[in-house]
């Protein structure tokens, strides 16, 4: 990107945040509407330029993703690139039978073990859905437990309900040897899809994000706008919305 492109993106982002805004503000944020930091315009919710500027100045451009052994970490900063897994596949190819079948807990365990032994993969973002557990709360907890038991590398997962976050945090505290130890070196983070393109907040996902911050679990905020469909067709416009 040229300096001109960067300036256009910055101006576009600030315009979207302060003038266009978002739909469906979560209830817990409604109390912050004060026409200064969070502003309501035509049933949409915008952010004040002062708040935007304050956030930009406070952002950390070096983030550490820790591992369980506390001896190594991933430094997310300029020039560093890492590869890992990802996705949420409900099916897996059964290599011996040459057919696809529902993914199970043992498959997630094996996938995490493989990643743990591969030097070219630096983190484990759960790639499979546990179809052998029907309860969403238990499925999210067991997904994390299985992943953490099979790899020392940083684990990324997700939860469907904000009430699950506390239970997940307690598991992490137990593994780390205490809450303070986990907060100092969090070896698990959550993928949260908090936006429904274009520019609608997902209330449930925002609740998950709030609980994650409360319990010291790092958050990776995912945005899935599609160029020309749920976001502008131009690269600059799509990046601005994202």
Predicted stretch roles:
Residues 1-106:
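Acidic/polar, glycine-rich intrinsically disordered N-terminal extensions of enzymes
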Residues 102-242:
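Helix-rich catalytic cores of soluble enzyme domains
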